[in-house]
């Protein structure tokens, strides 16, 4: 290994190759409240700037978790502290107002194979790409200048299943109707790959994928 400091890209590539590095590659994420507090205390940047300040080795170009009904956010009821909404995946959940936290899952619109095939499947396949390809390419070019390891990011099939069907329907269907489960995962994967391909076609050449 060279005695000079490695770039983030070199560092991460050496990590995957099980070679020595000058330090452990690093990356971080922040709760929205963390950045908001820092900004009140004098921070003049957003979380992307903070990652650059901390010499993060990774740079995410885009996030792909395809909504089935893009833009849908229907407030069903609310009180002083929470609001219950129908989201872009057709689910109903109760969220805190003004702060982050795990929502209470109230219900899921896709609760049967019939609903999936009649409404959700065609809507998901027909929805336009929700990834901002221009922003992704801009981040790619900036990351290359900074020597960072670039990646496309998204969620794998099980998380998509839980988001669309809910845990109870999802787990029962794995036993009772596995072909339906395979189809949901296949459609989700197809749409995610389509969105990533759009970023590549726009000019980005990412180093890899980071899938949650």
Please give the residue ranges for each predicted region.
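Catalytic cores of TIM-barrel enzymes
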Residues: 1-212
């Amino acid at each position: 290994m060279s005695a000079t400091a490695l770039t983030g890209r070199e560092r991460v590539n050496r990590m995957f190759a099980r070679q020595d590095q000058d330090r452990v590659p690093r990356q971080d994420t922040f709760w929205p409240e963390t950045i908001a507090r820092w900004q009140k205390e004098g921070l003049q940047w957003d979380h992307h700037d903070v990652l650059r300040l901390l010499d993060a080795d990774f740079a995410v170009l885009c996030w792909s978790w395809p909504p089935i009904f893009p833009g849908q956010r229907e407030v069903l009821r609310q009180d002083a502290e929470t609001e219950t909404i129908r989201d872009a995946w057709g689910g109903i959940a109760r969220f805190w107002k003004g702060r982050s936290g795990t929502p209470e899952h109230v219900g899921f619109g896709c609760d049967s194979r019939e609903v999936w095939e009649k409404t959700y499947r065609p809507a998901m396949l027909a929805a336009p790409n929700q990834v901002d390809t221009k922003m992704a390419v801009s981040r790619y070019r900036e990351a290359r200048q900074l020597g960072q390891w670039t990646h496309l990011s998204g969620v794998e099939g099980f998380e998509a299943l839980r988001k669309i069907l809910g845990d109870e329907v999802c787990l029962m269907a794995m036993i009772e109707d596995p072909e339906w489960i395979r189809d949901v995962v296949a459609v989700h994967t197809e749409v995610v790959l389509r969105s990533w391909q759009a970023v590549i076609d726009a000019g980005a050449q990412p180093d890899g994928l980071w899938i949650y």
